[in-house]
Amino acid sequence: MVYTYLIIALTRIYFLCCKTILRQKEGYRLLKNFMDWLQNKILPPMSKVGNNKYLVSIRNGLVLTLPAIISGSVFLIVGNIPITAWANFIKPYMNMIGVAVNGSFGIISLLAAIGIGYELSKELGVDPISGAGLSTMAFVIVSFNDKFKLDTNNFSSSGLFTAIITAMISVTIFNFFIKKNIIIKLPDGVPTAVSNSFVSLLPGFVILVLFWFIRMPLHIDINLVIQSIFHPLLFAMNTLPGILVYTFLVSLLWVCGIHGDMTLEGIADPIFLQFLAANGTAFAHHQPLPYATAAGFSSLMVNVGGTGATITLVVLMLFSKSKTYRDLGRVAFPGALFEINEPVIFGFPIVMNPLTMIPFIVIPLILATGSYLLIHLGLMNAPVAMVPWTMPPIIGPLMATGWDWRAAVWSAVELVLAGAMYYPFFKVAEKGMLAKEKTSTD
């Protein structure tokens, strides 16, 4: 009940602030100055972060894990359809379904080592196949336990950060040897595949010795060390303040014209994917879900209909008095239905627009707060399965939470809330557009 009153209070404060800002030119001028500051001070460094070779490689390399996660999620969803007749029918086959779930979720770190090694090698201009192989070797070496047995538990979500670190170190060493020309060269007539294998021989041996020496003679559990280093970050991203900071940064970057989701994916995706894999495994074994902010939380429960919940803005445009907005709404609606909102962000526009900056940033914060609290209080499941981010509102949360009908109801409520919050700003924009249309007609 306290959380409910908190959300209501925040919403009232939001509308009061909106009313004050929209009625005063001074407030609008301050927003314009703030936008100029963002463009001059924040945009350049954040662009560099988004283009960092290592972060780009992590983002692109993790794509290799998605087929396994999505395929395993299909089995997870099918095996937990909340229909009594179906549950009775599928019960004898649940162990078989568990094999598919464990066999897909259980190797995401191994796939990440392969994918990141490949992508980083491409970014650095060295042979990607060799880079992927060396990264995988390093990750497997550090996955042996003190009893000299391979611990395949590290191949699951728990070893994801280890896979990332070992891949980056391995490819960096590989790149150093290649660029410094410390390699075994073969005659020009030798096939490329054979030549590349000999080129990677010396760096491969150094990588093997390095990780073997750390893991075996020194008895350092690299996976445990890395987990302890990243534990504060993992803890923070599963808290309400942590997810609010992330949500704020994504929206703020979009307002500045930077793809916020893509810029932060290299940092956030390993965390959210690890959360999702852990939730999926817990759900399959009928255990409590450990993480509220797993992959799907932001895309399906916060940014309904695209970042900023802009599908509601599109609906407002469809019924606008302005012909310009009606036409834009017709063009943007099909994409917005499937979470694609670039036509709105750049067409309305939202980018570098002081008027729409407030709702675009604040609405996701309110929706994130509501979603997190509902999950935290046990009133709605957290995401347990990976569904495509293009899944429409209501349907996407329903499937991602393992057919929790409460998630679908909350998604519908979110659409109403977002629409109500966009409405006053849209009416101001509509008034200005109608004046422009009248002037052009005259």
Stretches with model-predicted labels:
Residues 87-99, 171, 223-230, 289-295, ...:
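Short juxtamembrane and helix-loop transition motifs at transmembrane-helix boundaries
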Residues 205-320:
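Generic multipass alpha-helical transmembrane bundles of integral membrane proteins
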Residues 39-61, 94, 187-195, 343-345:
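Cytosolic juxtamembrane amphipathic/interface segments immediately preceding
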